[in-house]
Amino acid sequence: MAQITAALVKELREKTSAGIMDAKKALVETNGNMEKAIDVLKERGVAKAAKKADRVAAEGMTDVIEAGNTAAIIELNSETDFVASNEKFLNLLHLTAKVILEHKPADLKAALAIPVEEGTLNDQIVQTSAHTGEKITLRRFNVVEKNDNQTFGVYSHMGGQISVITLLENSDSTTAKDIAMHIAAIAPKYLSREDVPKDVVEHEKSIQMKADDLGNKPDNIKEKIVEGRLGKFLDELALLNQPFVKGEGESVAEYLKKQGATIKSFIRYQVGEGIEKQESNLADEVAKQING
């Protein structure tokens, strides 16, 4: 039997917004398996939608820029948000975006080797890290290119916590930016329903089929109910099916059709996606409530 620690309960609560005892019970039932515990809570309707499973956990900043037919988006991480707002960190952030846009490196190794005024980009990162006293890393970047018939939409949100690039055809810059703003706010995972991997759909279906509220309903009724829920699940994940944030009930697809535009791709960065933070004092608070 795995030991159910306060830290484990805390992590599950952060991912699902479940209560302390619900989280502890799910972990006990699944012998401490985090993914299975999340599924158990979803089946019982205790967990929030899957968005909570992707809690942001690191500090730093994103940046996005464009010039001509090229756009670049980057994420630079620090250990604290205090350093992320430091002038030297911000100067490094903008320098990094600028040289990556200019040089279009193939990977992180090539990006860090880009020559700058004083040595390489990596040298600048090390120097800024030494000045701030914190580890600073270039976590990721993307360079996107377009043709003359295409339009970029670039947008940064929450002071650089989120950045987005959209690539549209037959679009003006206002429409492209509006879509980028929508993506920043709503965080779609995929462009369309068809882009959602089959295993993601099947996994969600298996959870919904076990949902407590379906009870002893006949299988054919269960299938219809689950089909409806899967439709809503896919609409939440797929950009084109989401209600457009600046519209009046229309979907993103309907808005784009009205504008005569087509979206080809998008990239959304949010600081710290998928990075584990160090444990905070909240674990101690959870322990007190569990052991009460």
Curated annotation (Swiss-Prot):
Residues 80-83 are annotated as: Involved in Mg(2+) ion dislocation from EF-Tu. It holds the Pfam family EF_TS. InterPro entries: EF-Ts_dimer_sf (IPR036402), Transl_elong_EFTs/EF1B (IPR001816), Transl_elong_EFTs/EF1B_dimer (IPR014039), Transl_elong_Ts_CS (IPR018101), UBA-like_sf (IPR009060). It comes from the Bacteria. GO terms for cellular component: cytoplasm. One of its GO terms (molecular function) is translation elongation factor activity. Its main location: cytoplasm. Gene3D superfamilies: 1.10.286.20, DNA helicase RuvA subunit, C-terminal domain (1.10.8.10), Elongation factor Ts, dimerisation domain (3.30.479.20). PROSITE patterns: EF_TS_1 (PS01126), EF_TS_2 (PS01127). It is found in: Cytoplasm. Keywords: Cytoplasm, Elongation factor, Protein biosynthesis. Associates with the EF-Tu.GDP complex and induces the exchange of GDP to GTP. It remains bound to the aminoacyl-tRNA.EF-Tu.GTP complex up to the GTP hydrolysis stage on the ribosome. Belongs to the EF-Ts family. This is Elongation factor Ts. It comes from Oenococcus oeni (strain ATCC BAA-331 / PSU-1). The lineage of its organism: Bacteria, Bacillati, Bacillota, Bacilli, Lactobacillales.
